From Swiss-Prot:
Annotated gene: rpoB
Name this polypeptide is given: DNA-directed RNA polymerase subunit beta
Enzyme Commission number(s): 2.7.7.6
Gene Ontology annotations for the cellular component aspect, listed alphabetically: DNA-directed RNA polymerase complex
InterPro entries on file: RNA_pol_Rpb2_3
Protein task: DNA-dependent RNA polymerase catalyzes the transcription of DNA into RNA using the four ribonucleoside triphosphates as substrates.
Self-association and partners: The RNAP catalytic core consists of 2 alpha, 1 beta, 1 beta' and 1 omega subunit. When a sigma factor is associated with the core the holoenzyme is formed, which can initiate transcription.
Keywords associated with the record: DNA-directed RNA polymerase, Nucleotidyltransferase, Transcription, Transferase
Catalytic activity: RNA(n) + a ribonucleoside 5'-triphosphate = RNA(n+1) + diphosphate
GO MF entries: DNA binding; DNA-directed RNA polymerase activity
Gene Ontology biological-process annotations: DNA-templated transcription
Region feature (Disordered): 74-101
Compositionally biased residues, Basic and acidic residues: 86-101
Species per Swiss-Prot/TrEMBL record: Mycolicibacterium peregrinum
Length: 101
């Protein structure tokens, strides 16, 4: 799966949590006092997105010990993770040095 699909799934999870909160508030609040501002809370959606970027295998903390380590970290590219290569399936053409180097 692509990164976009993974983020889309997380947003769906957040929206379903928000829907559950809205439905619960609609049953507990007075009909005359209900406004969109009192019903809708975006915290579940924000929490789902933060959870994805904080705990996903595709996210990394950037090495910022010094400017050179930050630069080399930005140059690294990993094709591992969900939907990518595994260490067992990576062939020689993937492990070989690219001709541009």
């Amino acid at each position: 799966r692509t990164v976009g699909e993974l983020i889309q799934n997380q947003i769906r999870v957040g929206l379903s949590r928000m829907e559950r909160v809205v439905r619960e508030r609609m049953t507990t609040q007075d009909v005359e006092a209900i406004t969109p501002q009192t019903l809708i809370n975006i915290r579940p959606v924000v929490a789902a997105i933060k959870e994805f970027f904080g705990t996903s295998q595709l996210s990394q903390f950037m090495d910022q010990n010094n400017p050179l380590s930050g630069l080399t970290h930005k140059r690294r590219l990993s094709a591992l993770g969900p939907g990518g290569l595994s260490r067992e399936r990576a062939g020689l053409e993937v492990r070989d040095v690219h001709s541009s180097h």
